[in-house]
Amino acid sequence: MEGRRFAAVLILPICMLAPGAVASKRWTRPSVCNLPAESGTGTQSLKRFYYNSDKMQCRTFIYKGNGGNDNNFPRTYDCQKKCLYRPG
């Protein structure tokens, strides 16, 4: 009986800490993904991708070549890698 009580005393604090340990590893979307698409300035017409936080997906827009913000990716893969949560 004494052995069981000892095991319970050791296991209980570990179980109480586990939820906090998991919560601290929550994934949060980078703030750049919340920026609006900005065409920038210039004369080019480049197809780029931005993360649309309302639709929760990467969408295309036309980038003019200069300026804008960092929610601007050359490939849809780059946008998804940065802004879409992938468990595992």
UniProtKB/Swiss-Prot annotation:
Family designation: Belongs to the venom Kunitz-type family.
Positions where Proline amide occurs in the chain: P87
Molecular function per GO: potassium channel regulator activity; serine-type endopeptidase inhibitor activity; toxin activity
Disulphide-bridged cysteine pairs: C33-C83, C58-C79
Localization terms from the record: Secreted
Keyword annotations of the record: Amidation, Disulfide bond, Ion channel impairing toxin, Neurotoxin, Potassium channel impairing toxin, Protease inhibitor, Secreted, Serine protease inhibitor, Signal, Toxin, Voltage-gated potassium channel impairing toxin
Functional note: Blocks specifically voltage-activated potassium channels (Kv) of the Shaker family.
Keyword Repeat: no
Post-translational modification (record): Contains 2 disulfide bonds instead of 3, as for all Kunitz domain proteins.
CDD domains: Kunitz_conkunitzin
GO cellular component: extracellular space
Gene3D superfamilies, per the entry: Pancreatic trypsin inhibitor Kunitz domain
The protein, known as: Kunitz-type conkunitzin-B1
BPTI/Kunitz inhibitor domain residues: 33-83
Expression tissues: Expressed by the venom duct.
Endpoints of the signal sequence: 1-23
